[in-house]
Amino acid sequence: AYANGAEGIAVTYLAKEILSEQGYRTELLNADIAPIFTSLARGKTDVFMDSWMPVTHADYFQKYDGKLEILGQIYDSARIGLVVPEYVPIHTIEELGAHTRRFSGEIVGIDAGTGIMKCTEKAIPEYGLDYRLMISSGPAMTALLKKAIDKKEWIVVTGWTPHWMFDRFRLRVLEDSRNVYGEAEQIHSIARKGFSKEHPFAAALLGNIHLSDTEISSLMRAIEETSGTETRAVRQWMDGHRDLVDSWIPEKEEYSR
């Protein structure tokens, strides 16, 4: 399963193609974060490659304690927060309060129920902001961001790293003095309880996937630049990073499918 985050789409299609090379048949399910965790906990879905810890998805791990498995750590230094274009002359979340009109009193969000949306719902009263949080999606958010930047308009969005938009645009993450959005997080691959026992080779392979800043940025950029052809973009990326991909594949004789 995967949600609409750019990094989640990227690593999910990457995992799918690597598993396909190893002879596995996979089915992708696109859904919001909350239904994904519910489906994993009920054993209806096998794997989710974009779980953020220890803050963003902590509520789901607490709710479904004992029903999920952590396979591995994909990325080491993920962040969430509020983001503005660099030409907007503010640097902190507090400063949003003095410029409500310039931002039309709106923070452009993504899918409802995601960790970053929950944090933003807390940040608005915490910082005393008179803003409404707009529910949309990752692709819709970046489309509105691009439209505003093209016109040099003021806009504030919910943003996170890793994301290709930081390569495409000159952006600034607003300082969060009250630490509503937490510190740096890690992105994990997780599974339903029992998956590792039933599919030890696949679980080990997925758990081995780990990407640096440069690697995940290049993967996301390849997908974003070839919208609608994720499979082809991922295969091309794999061809250019074959040694890395091969390093993730366990010795088959150590596992029985």
Report residues per predicted region.
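Ligand-binding pocket segment of bilobal, Venus flytrap-like solute-binding proteins
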Residues: 45-49, 116-178
